[in-house]
Amino acid sequence: MSCGLNDVNVSTISLQMALWRPNESKVYLPPTPVSKVISTDVYVTRTNVYYHGGSSRLLTVGHPYYSIKKSNNKVAVPKVSGYQYRVFHVKLPDPNKFGLPDADLYDPDTQRLLWACVGVEVGRGQPLGVGVSGHPYYNRLDDTENAHTPDTADDGRENISMDYKQTQLFILGCKPPIGEHWSKGTTCNGSSAAGDCPPLQFTNTTIEDGDMVETGFGALDFATLQSNKSDVPLDICTNTCKYPDYLKMAAEPYGDSMFFSLRREQMFTRHFFNLGGKMGDTIPDELYIKSTSVPTPGSHVYTSTPSGSMVSSEQQLFNKPYWLRRAQGHNNGMCWGNRVFLTVVDTTRSTNVSLCATEASDTNYKATNFKEYLRHMEEYDLQFIFQLCKITLTPEIMAYIHNMDPQLLEDWNFGVPPPPSASLQDTYRYLQSQAITCQKPTPPKTPTDPYASLTFWDVDLSESFSMDLDQFPLGRKFLLQRGAMPTVSRKRAAVSGTTPPTSKRKRVRR
């Protein structure tokens, strides 16, 4: 099309070809749906019935560093240290077999009863004190605070003692607490030589009664990671120090291991040493200038001795009540299986007492005439407030509980029947007869206690429940914070039935 300059009604049209491009934005698919965990407040109904349960005075005595065995390898004196976990396995009575004050409280055909822990107090006896640990052959090469000429002897170990990190904690749940520590791992293709640094592996285990706490030297399996048995004190050099895995217990789907927890830790470093031995990792040359007087650098594996500092009654977590209103997880204090696990650590009462016995009498003092012994004592008193709850076992709730813990339905006599089998089963009469083929062994019966293989301090409260809350210290505190008045006598139930009204006699004035 041609046009002149004088053409007035002329317009220019620009045509552009459309170009298709694929969508460059990423498409995110929805995640795979997972089963939703609901809170116990959704399907558990709380009642207004409360019980008090308390233990007697719990005492334990032993050697603070190691267990003492007899000639037949039987333990004569157990190891009892202020730096051990005390894990109490508290067994509760079955509320479905309990004598309740109101028979119409629940329907046994469609409902079941269970306990909810709403109050706890851990009583601690014995005075405050700091326990001391050590090693007669502690691997102390130099005091790096007070430098001197390095000792080149093959054995520079010395008798060193110290106090540990100060720890107070207790964890409440219906399952045992989970601990974490570092253990010896495995190398790929077995490519390790003698003297190589062992690989580390993060390990989760159940914290049992008697396990050592983390004392300031790390949560390690010292038996496999320190073969010289002299880098740490006696009581942990062949043991595993565990630390509660708060992250895993807080992220637990059902929240059974930790309803709530309290902890207080403090530590400072008292002495600074370096360890003797051949250096496994050499210092790179670019990090220092070589010396003519000391051609070989000394030990650069530096270590320290911890200290928990002063203990005070103003910083105590024990001997005071705690009320559980809202748990950190989905389990709001429900005691599944009629059990509670209470984990306690208190290093502020870790005093080790020395005992002396005379072996030979003499007019003058002679140290060899006396035998010195070491012991540690602990004292506990546990008190709980439990609330009676009921749960209606609908098909949906039963399926949910079966997915959570099938043993609960078995204990409530609500077992799920196995799927029907259409095949015909063969059954021999004489199973021990040599005339028939060898029969498969009978599978072992599942133990009723899933924690029978673990070590706990068992506390049975089956005979210690009472509704008279005002007769116990924790019960009176519970009534006070609820604003309820103590009961003087129990109210008797009204007698059913009708009685004929008595006719009043009229007065006649004369």
UniProtKB/Swiss-Prot annotation:
The record's subcellular location field reads:
Virion; Host nucleus
Gene responsible for this protein: L1
Segments passing through the bilayer: none
Please report the name of this protein according to its UniProt entry. Major capsid protein L1
Q: GO BP, one example?
A: endocytosis involved in viral entry into host cell
Give the protein's function. Forms an icosahedral capsid with a T=7 symmetry and a 50 nm diameter. The capsid is composed of 72 pentamers linked to each other by disulfide bonds and associated with L2 proteins. Binds to heparan sulfate proteoglycans on cell surface of basal layer keratinocytes to provide initial virion attachment. This binding mediates a conformational change in the virus capsid that facilitates efficient infection. The virion enters the host cell via endocytosis. During virus trafficking, L1 protein dissociates from the viral DNA and the genomic DNA is released to the host nucleus.
Where does it sit, as one GO cellular component term? T=7 icosahedral viral capsid
Report keywords, A-Z: Capsid protein, Disulfide bond, Host nucleus, Host-virus interaction, Late protein, T=7 icosahedral capsid protein, Viral attachment to host cell, Viral penetration into host cytoplasm, Virion, Virus endocytosis by host, Virus entry into host cell
The principal localisation class reads: virion
Pfam families cross-referenced by the UniProt entry: Late_protein_L1 (PF00500)
Q: Which family does it belong to?
A: Belongs to the papillomaviridae L1 protein family.
Entry GO MF terms: structural molecule activity
Renumbered residue ranges of the record's region Disordered: 489-510
Instruction: Specify the species.
Output: Human papillomavirus type 2a
**Summary of subunit composition and partner proteins:** Self-assembles into homopentamers. The capsid has an icosahedral symmetry and consists of 72 capsomers, with each capsomer being a pentamer of L1. Interacts with the minor capsid protein L2; this interaction is necessary for viral genome encapsidation. Interacts with protein E2; this interaction enhances E2-dependent replication and transcription activation.
Indicate whether Ribonucleoprotein appears among the record's keywords: no
The protein's superkingdom reads Viruses
